[in-house]
Amino acid sequence: MHTRTVFSFLTFFLFCLASAQTYEIRYTNSYNGKVQTDQPSTIVLVNKNENVIVNTAIKEHKSTYPFEITKVEKPSNTVVSYAFLKPGKIISTSDRESVGKQTFELTPETKKILGYTCKKAVTKVNSNTIEIWYTQDLKLQGGPSVLGQNLGLVLEVERNKNSLITAQSVQKVRDAGIESILKGDIQTTDPLGYKDLLWKSRFTTLSIFDRETINFSDASQSNDSIKRYANGTIILKKVKFPTLAEGENIFTELRQQSNGDAYDRTGTVFVIPQDKEKSFFDGLEKGAKTLPAYDNGNGKHYYGVVSTENYSPAMEMMRFFTAFGIGNFNHIQLKGKNWQTISPYRQDITELKPSLSGKELWVGVFIGNYDKGGHTVSLDITIHKSDQNVYKNNVAIPLFNTLNIMEMAGQDYSTMFNKDKGLWVEFTLKKDLKNAQLRYTTTGHGGWENGDEFVPKTNSVFIDGNMVFSFIPWRTDCGSYRLYNPASGNFQDGLSSSDLSRSNWCPGTVTNPNFISLGDLKAGKHTVQIKIPQGPTEGTSFSAWNVSGVLLGVQ
């Protein structure tokens, strides 16, 4: 990428305006016959030398960043795109070929638009049918997009018979009114780099981990920015979340590869609430047994898994499962199998926004493994301004998380479901909670023939003693991810281990949470109980269930 000044463009542009008559065409957008008044109108400045495509918001200096201005140079039909990423940051790219490659079916149909006789041309773009109405009366070429630049002056474009952009006025102008916008230095880049920079400028990225190792080794050490626990199986970093406004969506995105471990492993991305006297961070620093213990009567104590008056468990953002050996074991060859090189995991976590907004919190990743090479992971959290507003809750309270994140530091497996009591949590609401939901994530484990990993089991959820939800968490799509699992073992029946259906998880995938409606909950004490008919042990083999729950709602 190199830098050039915009001065030459401005000089040439102003020269063009002075030497050739310029027309300003204003367009309106409509969808299914309804004018889209919430969108700025497209403006095209056309003369014999070049076209410039902007909109009313840009011309009036009211556009939000990022925004684009497109110029079509004539007679070469070179498309020059300018992206204004933020104040003082402009990039551009040039395309000399796209206009010339356009093909159209020219039809005999005609109609009048603004008094001009228009002809119809039809083309297809990415399976979309585009109808273009253009006039040759003005002896000009241009339009509201790069489509049809060679046909004439495009006055109407219709896509798939429902989306329409139509010219509302055509007038001669002396002053284009955009000179003050095009100021400063411009960085030129290739088309792919341009698209990437423009795309990434549309959202905020919190880069948390970049190719960090998660392994099992006594040599794993913390540094100034990243803490490591449980022999390197947990990595942790403090993250400052910006204030998240209504209408902003938040995603977590993790990329993982094997760095030596060939097996499918349980993984989780989590955040540590610090709203009470004790937190999960205390357990990491001082040992799991310093955290509150849960006792269901089976003789074991499960530390740090349930909320108490003085303790909040780790809040799970995303449950994921590593594939069998992706990346490090791609040398294993099978005919017709072209292995993927990285496992991507991405999940919308907007419902957790109330517990993140404006706070500085520890964010961690755990992968349960006993391999010195282990895994490499990169983690980003992205924030997007969006018209989609599915989650309207302003409360997110972690109630339980039985996934033993500190497994390699002595935290026991979640085998509490071998008793009828299962998991039982008492919590207190200080205010009424409307439209309450339980964000419930569950996966069954026990990797032998009769283990709960491979045996469907009913999960039942009770609120204040009443069953509100019951289902069998079961994934039957695991075979879809075979190409992420090069080290998966193959059986005599023609199946591979990664093909097998499991209790709500597959190697190489995310496990989605269930959103269980609870209605309105009054202020005061409540209980939540999870019951699962956990299978019995066989020798040294046992089953366990990793369940996490976050209470959502509006206060």
Specify the residue positions occupied by each region the protein language model found.
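Conserved catalytic-core segments centered on acid/base and nucleophilic motifs
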Residues: 15, 111-113, 119-123, 427, ...
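Short amphipathic alpha-helical segments
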Residues: 21-22, 30, 550-555
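Sterically constrained small-residue positions within well-ordered secondary structures
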Residues: 11, 16-18, 35, 112-114, ...
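Extracellular/secretory-pathway and virion-surface proteins
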Residues: 181-555
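Extended soluble regions of mature proteins
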Residues: 22-199
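Bacterial Sec-dependent N-terminal signal peptides
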Residues: 1-25
